[in-house]
Amino acid sequence: MEKYLSVTTLTKYLKMKFDKDPYLERVYLTGQVSNFRKRPTHQYFSLKDDHAVIQATIWSGIYQKLGFDLEEGMKINVIGRVQVYEPSGSYSIIIEKAEPDGVGALAIQFEQLKKKLTEEGLFQERFKQALPQFSKRIGVVTSRSGAVIRDIITTVSRRFPGVDILLYPTKVQGEGAAEEIARNIARANQRDDLDLLIIGRGGGSIEDLWAFNEEIVVRAIFESRLPVISSVGHETDVTLADFVADRRAATPTAAAELATPVTKLDVLTHLQNQEKRMATAVRNVLSKKQEALKKCSQSVIFRQPERLYDGYLQRLDQLQLRLKQSLRTRISDNKQLVQARTHQLVQLSPVTKIQRYQDRLGQLDKLLDSQMALVYDAKVAEAKRLSEALLMLDTSRIVARGYAIVKKEESVVDSVESLKKKDQVTLLMRDGQVELEVKDVKTKEI
């Protein structure tokens, strides 16, 4: 009886076959990129030819080291291993290395990196540094044994003897060359006594010059504090190092000439010309001063020097007169001020105040005596008048003169209106009193 396998069992069997097949552990494959969409980490796409398609995967760490970007339709050569993905029962190639297919592979990498760095702005003119006019020490990053360093030393020594050349022996092609170039550029920038840096090598194929197209080298040049001259290959060779460097030289000799724009002969010639111009300028100044001295010696002041002081003497007399007037005015003002202050002090003196108060007290004492006398006289007169009035009111005196006083209930009757018939009244007379009864009341017609 036939035994049926499950899908899982079959898939696991196929995976085991794939994993144990030595041929599938390292496959060399060429194909065209299809269904590619760049992702931030791992890349998943297809490789195809005219008759078949296989899924492909590149892990992010591998992809970052490729040196170029995948593009839709690009033909590439890859090395990888084939594996089965059990959940879907599909197989794919896990790519470990990849490069563009054909002669233009490096050109593609060059253009892609150039585009990337251009977009970042590394090649912009605003980042270029000016080369120094005079350099005391120049650093050179190149091979120890190449013709480059010999040409640079010869040219610099000829143009400006005394300039120091500091060589950083560097591997300029092959594996590890780019890292060593970048490392020596960084080392040179750590020194404070370098004025300029030249990097370069002689001519060669694009593969020979490729280290100077690596991103690590380009960024090292961009980050250099020192101005950098690039001299890589022949005049027709162009590298990314040339784009990012502050200046590009077609040959090592040209690089040395750029590094020493002013030669020793130029300096000597300039100094000689300056010496001549200074001598001419001194002669001209001396001639002008002599002419001025001659004119001065012929002037009236030198012939009659006493006239030089006429104006000053007149001015001095005027100032002396003004000074005397000013002093007299100030003395007079100060005298008046002293007198005024003296008068104020006298007025404010305690003795003066006491004297004023004593005078005022005497005046008030006299005024008080006068007022008291007046008040006394007035009071005496008033008392006399009141005494006379009291005497006039004394009943004994009234009746003594022959008058009689009528009283009703101990009250003096001064009007008939206060009486009525049958009222009992008392009539006071000089020698006694009479008790009477009112019989009739008659009002006097007025």
Curated annotation (Swiss-Prot):
Signal peptide: none annotated. Pfam families: Exonuc_VII_L (PF02601), tRNA_anti_2 (PF13742). The keyword Chloroplast does not apply. It catalyses: Exonucleolytic cleavage in either 5'- to 3'- or 3'- to 5'-direction to yield nucleoside 5'-phosphates. GO terms for cellular component: cytoplasm; exodeoxyribonuclease VII complex. It is found in: Cytoplasm. Its EC number is 3.1.11.6. The keyword Hydrolase applies. One of its GO terms (molecular function) is exodeoxyribonuclease VII activity. GO terms for biological process: DNA catabolic process. InterPro entries: Exonuc_VII_L, Exonuc_VII_lsu_C, OB-fold_nuc-bd_dom. Keywords: Cytoplasm, Exonuclease, Hydrolase, Nuclease. Belongs to the XseA family. Heterooligomer composed of large and small subunits. Bidirectionally degrades single-stranded DNA into large acid-insoluble oligonucleotides, which are then degraded further into small acid-soluble oligonucleotides. NCBIfam families: xseA. This is Exodeoxyribonuclease 7 large subunit. It comes from Streptococcus pneumoniae (strain Hungary19A-6). The gene is xseA.
